[in-house]
A protein has these predicted regions:
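N-terminal acidic leader/helix
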Residues: 1-29, 35, 64, 68-69
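Short, charge-rich amphipathic interface segments used for partner binding and complex assembly
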Residues: 29-68
Length: 74
């Protein structure tokens, strides 16, 4: 597995961690890690701006959904 594939897998894992977080702190921690992985992909593997923007937006949406789910007690 290449470094790029490992970073993408770690990014997906953090998205899962955001989605399954039981408290806001855990979701924020996973969000920060996911953003670091996106940054590494951007700088070390020359990911395109559109791809990077989409990945950041995905992280934000996952966090928003997790916070909404937790606030509604679902």
């Amino acid at each position: 597995m290449t470094e790029k594939e490992e970073l993408l897998e770690a990014y997906r894992k953090e998205l899962h961690n955001i989605a399954t977080a039981r408290d806001p702190l855990a979701a924020e921690k996973a969000m920060c890690k996911a953003r670091v992985y996106v940054g590494e992909l951007k700088h070390n593997h020359k990911l395109g701006e559109k791809d990077v923007s989409d990945m950041y937006e995905t992280v934000d949406v996952f966090l928003w959904r997790a916070n909404r789910r937790m606030s509604e007690g679902i």
